[in-house]
């Protein structure tokens, strides 16, 4: 390790201009070691970035979210990230994960879909009639997150995350001017996504350049002023000590100020004609200040001043997306030092300039942006064969990709065309260029990020520098990279489908080494099998690399100890436990207020004024329009609890699983333990009736006494359907072959037709997937790559049928469209039955890491 560190230290000195004449002095050597540690850290733990291009800006329940993912090495922005698996999750307004995808990354690309229809397709088993049991999703703000397992080492702030409004499905087909959210009480846990704290109106935050003010030293102070929704207040005037502050944009600005105890150190803002004063941060008696001039095209100039501190050698580093781009030490002239940096010698993007002592203490830090060598020069121009299209008419579209010199580029793009008659998206406005170069390295709301790339004139440069000034969050922690803070790798890079875990002794919770672990993974139909064996290391760890497969497979792990001692083998089977390290799921985060703030929608077509054909409500059962009601049993709403996924995660953490009653008690306060024995459960003070389901090959025998159903081990349960309507049993028709002879549902139907009863259907796991009765083994499942659906586009070349309607909002989607040698990519599709305005946008990353995006609006001229 010391040898590698020395090599990187020398490389850092050569690359970044360390020409200090006293290189052998210990202070300089120590400072250089911090810089070398940063370089080594980035080599051993490189970060990755993800950007998702979506087909639309907002959605309605029942629709599908289509996305194309770009995975890059964060430092170079090249599509060469070492991770080969991307996880994409859909989270409800409450923070529950309702859909997830595990996608194979090839050359930095993958794509998929997330359905906003719940998981109702799972619940057809066991029903004899055509009832449709729905685990209904609720409208609200949904979050899509994407990350690799390696990204989890750096915290969820590094994930890709976007929040979408998901509206109720329109009550009249195609009436997307209806944008409604419905709040519905469910049985779900009270542990929902927390709300962000409401801000004062207005809220002003001050950010001294470099991190702190020092008495008697002039410093630039950035400020940001926002309303109670976290959005910038643009119409603002400000002054300090009677002097007007200029260059305020999107509520952000800056000014020069020399703190002095004699001054009032306040800034006065005028908002909506009202004046209000805000006190500046208190100045330190001693310390360092950092001031940079980033207005020049070629060089960055940095001025450092100190006051009241003991003279010592100070190091300076610049980190760009984890890359050590610069290292040197300051040369003091009295209490001032100066740095000149050639911006052509550092990467383009967000830079982190850090000043630090030989003990690794940060004395000043500042973000700035470098436009030089920007990799975003790829242009995507989108054109169509006509300026406007009739309903159902064929559309011929061409996307042309060129470099800044106009040279055609062969590459893959993702292309979306949508109905633009209703503009109902949120505040998100990033594209692939602005996200990977700017927004992903910052935190908080950035209004119109494209503005900062429009020009390099003084106005744009000052606005961008003010944006850099008001950032408190750091994607790249200097202390961690420099080695002054501990860093533990908890999630390893995945270069394919792997199974890794640990074997430990349950009685004394210690790892077991030299244990032979045999693995057998097989497809649900048993046609495909993979088998391997390994021996655990000193930490009890094991790892298997599998060939690619899709969807869930059964997995059985067998333990043995080939040392010839029969007693050891028996003890192993009784005491050993197997944990599997699965990629941990995302945690619930607090939405920023700007993420759920909706601008006023724009509707470009006349809306209907006739009464809406509302959905029918039958004894709290939702019956969709157009469905013939027979015996009021077409649709039943339920809550689905996916026990298998949760119990496997608990097992892998070494937690006790418990039984069905204990599980439900933790899910919601409305579930109650009637006798405080976890034998009888109630919901809304009414006893719950459990219905165990019976299937061939399941873990249960011929009979399960109903009175004991709540005591069923979680390990035996696949999922639970809970019907929160007390009369659901009147409409529930279960197949007799899937019911036990003494099922309480039979008695309910025959004798208690008007009695309130809450039903919980318990679905068993397959016997091959249950561990509890197999000593020295672990039966579970292993998740393969997710199967990806193709986007459907109708063909109207023979004209639509009479009376046919088509209200598709996404008209065309291709996540992987290739351009030819002339840089052209052609797309052919058909308009829907009404669209007047189309919006098209495209994204790309070339193999050389060049970024490109393009968009256009196709509409008739007025």
Could you tell me what each predicted segment is?
Residues 1-33, 125:
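Bacterial Sec-dependent N-terminal signal peptides
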Residues 41-45, 56, 60, 81, ...:
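Surface-exposed, low-complexity/disordered segments
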């Amino acid at each position: 390790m010391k040898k590698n560190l020395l090599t990187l230290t020398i490389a850092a000195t050569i690359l970044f201009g360390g020409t200090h004449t006293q290189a052998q002095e210990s202070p300089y050597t120590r400072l250089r070691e911090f810089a070398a540690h940063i370089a080594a850290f980035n080599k051993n733990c490189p970060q990755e970035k993800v950007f998702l291009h979506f087909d639309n800006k907002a959605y309605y329940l029942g629709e599908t979210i289509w996305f194309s993912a770009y995975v890059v090495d964060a430092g170079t922005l090249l599509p060469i990230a070492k991770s080969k698996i991307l996880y994409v999750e859909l989270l409800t307004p409450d923070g529950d994960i309702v859909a997830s995808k595990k996608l194979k990354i090839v050359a930095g690309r993958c794509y998929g879909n997330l359905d906003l229809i719940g998981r109702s397709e799972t619940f057809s088993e066991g029903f004899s009639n055509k009832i449709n049991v729905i685990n209904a999703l609720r409208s609200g703000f949904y979050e899509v997150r994407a990350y690799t397992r390696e990204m989890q080492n750096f915290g969820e702030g590094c994930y890709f995350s976007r929040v979408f409004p998901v509206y109720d499905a329109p009550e009249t087909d195609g009436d997307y001017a209806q944008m409604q959210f419905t709040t519905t009480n469910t049985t779900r846990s009270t542990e929902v996504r927390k709300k962000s704290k409401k801000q004062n109106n207005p809220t002003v935050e001050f950010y001294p350049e470099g991190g702190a003010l020092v008495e008697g030293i002039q410093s630039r102070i950035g400020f940001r002023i926002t309303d109670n929704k976290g959005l910038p207040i643009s119409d603002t005037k400000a002054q300090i000590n009677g002097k007007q502050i200029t260059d305020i944009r999107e509520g952000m600005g800056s000014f020069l100020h020399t703190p002095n105890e004699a001054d009032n150190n306040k800034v006065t803002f005028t908002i909506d004609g009202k004046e209000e004063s805000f006190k500046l941060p208190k100045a330190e008696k001693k310390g360092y200040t950092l001031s940079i001039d980033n207005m020049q095209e070629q060089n960055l100039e940095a001025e450092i001043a100190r006051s009241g501190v003991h003279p010592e050698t100070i190091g300076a580093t610049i980190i760009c997306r984890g890359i050590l781009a610069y290292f040197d030490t300051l040369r003091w002239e009295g209490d001032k030092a100066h740095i000149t940096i050639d911006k052509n010698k550092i990467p383009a993007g967000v830079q982190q300039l850090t000043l630090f002592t030989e003990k690794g203490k940060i004395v000043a830090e500042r973000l700035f942006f470098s436009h030089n060598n920007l990799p975003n020069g790829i242009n995507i121009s989108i054109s169509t064969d006509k300026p406007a299209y009739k309903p159902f008419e064929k559309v011929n579209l061409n996307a042309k990709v060129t470099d800044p010199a106009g040279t055609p580029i062969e590459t893959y793009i993702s292309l979306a065309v949508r109905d633009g008659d209703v503009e109902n998206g949120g505040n998100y406005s990033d594209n692939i260029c602005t996200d990977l170069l700017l927004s992903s390295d910052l935190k908080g709301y950035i209004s119109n990020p494209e503005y900062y790339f429009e020009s390099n004139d003084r106005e744009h440069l000052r606005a961008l520098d003010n944006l850099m000034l008001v950032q408190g969050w750091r994607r790249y922690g200097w202390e961690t990279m420099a080695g002054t803070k501990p860093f533990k790798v908890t999630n390893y890079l995945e270069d394919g489908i792997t199974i890794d875990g640990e074997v430990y002794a349950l009685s004394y919770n210690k790892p077991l080494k030299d244990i032979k672990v045999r693995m057998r993974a097989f497809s649900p139909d048993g046609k495909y099998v993979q088998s391997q064996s390994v021996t655990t290391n000193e930490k009890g760890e094991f790892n298997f690399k599998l060939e690619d497969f899709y969807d869930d497979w059964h997995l059985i792990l067998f333990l043995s100890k080939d040392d010839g001692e029969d007693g050891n083998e028996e003890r192993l089977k009784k005491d050993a436990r197997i944990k599997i390290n699965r990629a941990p799921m995302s945690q619930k985060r607090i939405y920023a207020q700007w993420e759920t703030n909706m601008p006023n929608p724009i509707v470009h077509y006349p809306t209907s004024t006739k009464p809406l054909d509302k959905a029918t409500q039958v004894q709290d059962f939702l019956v969709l329009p157009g469905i013939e009601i027979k015996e009021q049993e077409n649709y039943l709403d339920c809550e689905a609890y996916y026990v298998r996924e949760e119990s496997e995660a608990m097992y892998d953490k070494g937690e006790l699983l418990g039984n069905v009653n204990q599980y439900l008690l933790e899910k919601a306060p409305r579930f109650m333990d009637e006798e405080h024995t976890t034998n009888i459960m109630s919901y809304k003070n009414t006893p719950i009736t459990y219905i165990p389901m019976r299937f061939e090959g399941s873990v249960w025998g011929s009979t399960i006494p109903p009175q004991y159903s709540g005591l069923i081990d979680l390990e035996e349960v696949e999922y639970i359907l809970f019907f929160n309507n007390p009369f659901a049993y009147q409409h529930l028709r279960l197949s007799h072959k899937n019911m036990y002879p003494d099922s309480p549902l039979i008695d309910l139907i025959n004798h208690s037709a008007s009695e309130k009863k809450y039903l919980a259907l318990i679905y068993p796991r397959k016997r091959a997937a249950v561990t509890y009765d197999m000593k020295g083994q672990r039966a579970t499942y292993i998740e393969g790559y997710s199967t990806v659906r193709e986007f459907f586009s109708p063909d109207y070349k023979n004209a639509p049928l009479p009376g046919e309607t088509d209200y598709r909002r996404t008209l065309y989607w291709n996540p992987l469209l290739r351009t030819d040698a002339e840089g052209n990519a052609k797309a052919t599709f058909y308009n829907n039955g009404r669209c007047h305005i189309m919006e098209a946008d495209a994204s790309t990353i070339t193999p050389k890491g060049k970024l490109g995006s393009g968009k256009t609006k196709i509409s008739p001229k007025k």
